[in-house]
Protein backbone atom coordinates (compact mmCIF):
# COMPACT_ATOMS: atom_id res chain seq x y z
CA UNK A 1 0.00 0.00 0.00
CA UNK A 2 1.03 3.59 -0.62
CA UNK A 3 -0.77 6.85 0.19
CA UNK A 4 -1.00 10.33 -1.31
CA UNK A 5 -2.98 13.09 0.39
CA UNK A 6 -4.57 16.08 -1.28
CA UNK A 7 -5.74 18.79 1.13
CA UNK A 8 -8.60 21.24 0.61
CA UNK A 9 -9.71 24.16 2.80
CA UNK A 10 -13.25 25.48 2.85
CA UNK A 11 -13.75 29.27 2.84
CA UNK A 12 -15.45 31.90 0.70
CA UNK A 13 -12.81 31.37 -1.99
CA UNK A 14 -11.69 27.79 -1.44
CA UNK A 15 -11.42 25.13 -2.59
CA UNK A 16 -10.93 26.83 -5.95
CA UNK A 17 -11.58 25.03 -9.23
CA UNK A 18 -7.83 25.11 -9.86
CA UNK A 19 -6.97 23.45 -6.54
CA UNK A 20 -9.65 20.79 -7.04
CA UNK A 21 -8.35 20.05 -10.53
CA UNK A 22 -4.63 20.11 -9.69
CA UNK A 23 -5.01 17.88 -6.64
CA UNK A 24 -7.20 15.45 -8.58
CA UNK A 25 -4.60 15.27 -11.35
CA UNK A 26 -1.78 14.67 -8.84
CA UNK A 27 -3.75 11.90 -7.12
CA UNK A 28 -4.43 10.25 -10.47
CA UNK A 29 -0.80 10.43 -11.62
CA UNK A 30 0.33 8.98 -8.30
CA UNK A 31 -2.23 6.17 -8.59
CA UNK A 32 -1.07 5.32 -12.10
CA UNK A 33 2.57 5.08 -11.02
CA UNK A 34 1.67 2.97 -7.99
CA UNK A 35 -0.44 0.50 -9.96
CA UNK A 36 2.31 0.21 -12.57
CA UNK A 37 4.53 -1.01 -9.71
CA UNK A 38 1.96 -3.58 -8.59
CA UNK A 39 0.94 -1.78 -5.41
CA UNK A 40 -2.38 -0.48 -4.07
CA UNK A 41 -2.84 3.30 -3.99
CA UNK A 42 -4.69 4.81 -1.06
CA UNK A 43 -6.28 7.93 -2.54
CA UNK A 44 -6.84 10.59 0.12
CA UNK A 45 -8.70 13.77 -0.86
CA UNK A 46 -9.18 15.48 2.52
CA UNK A 47 -11.55 18.39 2.94
CA UNK A 48 -10.43 19.87 6.25
CA UNK A 49 -12.66 20.50 9.27
CA UNK A 50 -11.02 23.89 9.90
CA UNK A 51 -13.44 26.79 9.51
CA UNK A 52 -16.97 27.88 10.35
CA UNK A 53 -18.71 26.22 7.41
CA UNK A 54 -21.88 24.16 7.75
CA UNK A 55 -22.11 20.42 7.20
CA UNK A 56 -24.17 21.15 4.09
CA UNK A 57 -21.28 23.17 2.66
CA UNK A 58 -18.90 20.35 3.53
CA UNK A 59 -21.20 17.93 1.70
CA UNK A 60 -21.25 20.10 -1.42
CA UNK A 61 -17.50 20.72 -1.50
CA UNK A 62 -16.52 17.14 -0.65
CA UNK A 63 -18.79 15.82 -3.40
CA UNK A 64 -17.16 18.19 -5.91
CA UNK A 65 -13.69 17.11 -4.81
CA UNK A 66 -14.37 13.36 -4.94
CA UNK A 67 -16.20 13.51 -8.28
CA UNK A 68 -13.31 15.39 -9.86
CA UNK A 69 -10.83 12.91 -8.40
CA UNK A 70 -12.61 9.99 -10.02
CA UNK A 71 -12.90 11.81 -13.33
CA UNK A 72 -9.10 12.13 -13.33
CA UNK A 73 -8.60 8.55 -12.15
CA UNK A 74 -10.66 7.32 -15.08
CA UNK A 75 -8.81 9.57 -17.55
CA UNK A 76 -5.59 7.96 -16.32
CA UNK A 77 -7.15 4.49 -16.74
CA UNK A 78 -6.79 3.55 -13.08
CA UNK A 79 -8.16 0.13 -12.10
CA UNK A 80 -10.74 1.36 -9.58
CA UNK A 81 -11.13 -2.14 -8.16
CA UNK A 82 -7.51 -1.87 -7.03
CA UNK A 83 -7.63 1.33 -4.98
CA UNK A 84 -8.76 2.37 -1.51
CA UNK A 85 -10.46 5.74 -1.05
CA UNK A 86 -9.61 7.61 2.16
CA UNK A 87 -12.07 10.51 2.46
CA UNK A 88 -13.25 12.76 5.26
CA UNK A 89 -16.66 12.35 6.83
CA UNK A 90 -19.20 15.12 6.28
CA UNK A 91 -18.93 17.44 9.27
CA UNK A 92 -19.53 21.06 10.20
CA UNK A 93 -16.41 23.19 10.62
CA UNK A 94 -14.58 23.21 13.94
CA UNK A 95 -15.67 26.80 14.68
CA UNK A 96 -19.18 26.45 13.30
CA UNK A 97 -22.22 26.94 15.52
CA UNK A 98 -24.14 24.54 13.29
CA UNK A 99 -22.94 21.18 14.59
CA UNK A 100 -24.95 18.15 13.49
CA UNK A 101 -25.78 14.83 15.11
CA UNK A 102 -23.91 11.60 14.44
CA UNK A 103 -26.99 10.37 12.59
CA UNK A 104 -26.76 13.29 10.18
CA UNK A 105 -23.00 12.83 9.81
CA UNK A 106 -23.65 9.24 8.75
CA UNK A 107 -26.48 10.09 6.37
CA UNK A 108 -24.67 13.02 4.75
CA UNK A 109 -21.50 10.97 4.38
CA UNK A 110 -23.34 8.09 2.74
CA UNK A 111 -25.18 10.50 0.44
CA UNK A 112 -21.86 11.98 -0.66
CA UNK A 113 -20.27 8.60 -1.34
CA UNK A 114 -23.26 7.16 -3.19
CA UNK A 115 -23.35 10.19 -5.48
CA UNK A 116 -19.60 10.49 -6.02
CA UNK A 117 -17.85 7.11 -5.84
CA UNK A 118 -18.05 4.52 -8.66
CA UNK A 119 -19.33 1.09 -7.67
CA UNK A 120 -16.06 -0.56 -8.72
CA UNK A 121 -14.28 0.88 -5.68
CA UNK A 122 -14.12 -1.95 -3.12
CA UNK A 123 -13.24 -0.14 0.07
CA UNK A 124 -13.44 3.18 1.86
CA UNK A 125 -11.19 3.88 4.86
CA UNK A 126 -12.17 7.09 6.63
CA UNK A 127 -9.71 9.55 8.08
CA UNK A 128 -10.62 11.01 11.47
CA UNK A 129 -9.61 14.55 10.57
CA UNK A 130 -9.47 16.05 14.04
CA UNK A 131 -12.54 14.34 15.52
CA UNK A 132 -12.28 13.06 19.07
CA UNK A 133 -11.84 9.33 19.55
CA UNK A 134 -15.47 8.88 20.57
CA UNK A 135 -16.82 11.06 17.75
CA UNK A 136 -14.81 9.20 15.12
CA UNK A 137 -15.92 5.84 16.54
CA UNK A 138 -19.59 6.74 16.90
CA UNK A 139 -19.78 8.28 13.43
CA UNK A 140 -18.11 5.27 11.80
CA UNK A 141 -20.48 2.96 13.67
CA UNK A 142 -23.57 4.75 12.39
CA UNK A 143 -22.20 4.95 8.85
CA UNK A 144 -21.94 1.16 8.90
CA UNK A 145 -25.35 0.72 10.49
CA UNK A 146 -26.95 2.79 7.75
CA UNK A 147 -24.70 1.55 4.94
CA UNK A 148 -26.87 0.33 2.08
CA UNK A 149 -24.03 0.15 -0.45
CA UNK A 150 -21.55 -2.55 -1.42
CA UNK A 151 -18.63 -0.46 -0.15
CA UNK A 152 -16.65 -1.84 2.78
CA UNK A 153 -16.44 1.07 5.26
CA UNK A 154 -13.53 1.00 7.69
CA UNK A 155 -11.08 3.35 9.39
CA UNK A 156 -7.60 4.69 8.80
CA UNK A 157 -7.29 6.92 11.85
CA UNK A 158 -4.32 8.75 13.30
CA UNK A 159 -5.14 10.80 16.38
CA UNK A 160 -8.51 9.12 16.91
CA UNK A 161 -6.69 5.79 17.27
CA UNK A 162 -3.51 6.88 19.05
CA UNK A 163 -4.35 9.83 21.32
CA UNK A 164 -5.32 7.94 24.49
CA UNK A 165 -2.39 5.56 24.18
CA UNK A 166 0.07 8.42 23.69
CA UNK A 167 -1.39 10.30 26.66
CA UNK A 168 -1.09 7.21 28.88
CA UNK A 169 2.44 6.50 27.66
CA UNK A 170 3.57 10.10 28.29
CA UNK A 171 2.78 9.63 32.00
CA UNK A 172 3.78 5.96 32.25
CA UNK A 173 6.80 5.57 29.97
CA UNK A 174 7.90 2.28 31.53
CA UNK A 175 4.44 0.70 31.41
CA UNK A 176 4.55 -0.84 27.95
CA UNK A 177 1.78 -3.33 28.70
CA UNK A 178 -0.53 -0.61 29.97
CA UNK A 179 0.07 1.50 26.87
CA UNK A 180 -0.65 -1.48 24.63
CA UNK A 181 -3.88 -2.19 26.53
CA UNK A 182 -5.07 1.39 26.01
CA UNK A 183 -4.22 1.24 22.30
CA UNK A 184 -5.81 -2.20 21.87
CA UNK A 185 -9.01 -0.98 23.51
CA UNK A 186 -9.30 1.90 21.07
CA UNK A 187 -8.50 -0.35 18.10
CA UNK A 188 -11.13 -2.84 19.26
CA UNK A 189 -13.74 -0.07 19.56
CA UNK A 190 -12.96 1.17 16.05
CA UNK A 191 -13.10 -2.37 14.67
CA UNK A 192 -16.53 -2.89 16.21
CA UNK A 193 -17.63 0.43 14.71
CA UNK A 194 -16.43 -0.77 11.30
CA UNK A 195 -18.95 -3.61 11.71
CA UNK A 196 -21.74 -1.40 13.07
CA UNK A 197 -21.50 -3.20 16.42
CA UNK A 198 -20.13 -0.46 18.69
CA UNK A 199 -22.07 1.08 21.57
CA UNK A 200 -21.07 3.68 24.15
CA UNK A 201 -21.38 1.26 27.08
CA UNK A 202 -18.53 -0.83 25.63
CA UNK A 203 -16.13 2.05 26.31
CA UNK A 204 -16.23 1.37 30.04
CA UNK A 205 -15.80 -2.40 29.85
Predicted feature residues:
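Active-site capping/gating regions of soluble enzymes
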Residues: 53-205
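Helix-rich catalytic cores of soluble enzyme domains
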Residues: 1-73
Amino acid sequence: FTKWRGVYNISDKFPSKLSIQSNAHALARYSALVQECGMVPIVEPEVLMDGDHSAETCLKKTSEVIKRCFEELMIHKIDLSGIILKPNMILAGTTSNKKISSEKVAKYTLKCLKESVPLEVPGIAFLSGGQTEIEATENLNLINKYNDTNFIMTYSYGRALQKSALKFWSKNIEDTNGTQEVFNHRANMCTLAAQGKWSADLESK
